[in-house]
Amino acid sequence: MPKRGLGIGMIVVCLIFLPATYAKTITQNFCKLSDFKCIRVKRHQSWESLFPDDHDRDIVKRINRLNIELYPGILLAVPKNLSTSNIMDFSPFPLKVDPQDEKLVIVSPAAEAWAAYDVDGTLIRWGPASAGANYCRDIGKPCHTHPGSFRVFTLGSSNCISHKFPLPNGGAPMPYCMYFNNGQALHGEPNGLPGYNASHGCVRLYVNDAEWLRYDFIEGPNPDNDYRGTQVIVEPYYPASSSSSPDEDDEE
């Protein structure tokens, strides 16, 4: 991954065209690369039995964008140089962008990932994400996470819950929620990420990633930032989405 500076506009261009690359699952596309091997999970195999080392296990989970409990038949892409790899080696985002003079979070539903850039434009952390699904059966319509530029306006704790889902009374856990667009928020997913966009419009994250964003990176409105919370840019799912208006669904 080149380390030269890239502007935010370049990120938008790069990620808009990601769906052609990510037309299949993230895992299937990695499996086509010579630097990866792919395995089918067998009965009684688990993350721990397949990848006893914490470092290796974390990288494989993040590459495949999932951390749910493994089941027989699931496909996993594994780097051939796993033991010497760093998670930044597999970032779908540039390692450096033009400085924006403020911190920035980018969410790419196409890459099923998020990125955190410091004020100097350096990528300091990225991770898997599960954004709004193409269709939600319980409400009978699409529930994409809305593309655009937003700012975090409300921060929650580990006890944050949805007041809407599951229907009709809500109650779904949304630990470390960070609301950025009406009822849409970044938050942890205690049940794990499945490797595809599956939410009602929120952006689901690993719980430890959400906790880090909530307490170590993202800021809500306060006097020090002129009451402008941390910027969150949500990229389109595909080029057409920039000219369409998916139905809005609040919360998880």
Please place each PLM-identified region on the residue numbering:
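Bacterial N-terminal signal peptides that target proteins for export
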Residues: 1-8
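N-terminal signal peptide c-region/cleavage motif recognized by signal peptidases
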Residues: 18-20
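Extracellular LysM carbohydrate-binding repeats and other cell-envelope/extracellular binding modules
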Residues: 24-32, 57-93
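Primarily a LysM-type cell-wall glycan-binding module
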Residues: 25-55
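Extracytoplasmic
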Residues: 34-36, 55, 71-73, 99-102, ...
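Solvent-exposed coil/turn segments that connect beta secondary-structure elements
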Residues: 65, 80-83, 110-111, 119-122, ...
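A structural motif detector for short, solvent-exposed N-terminal "entry" segments of globular domains
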Residues: 88-137
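Exported/periplasmic cell-wall-interacting domains
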Residues: 141-147, 159-252
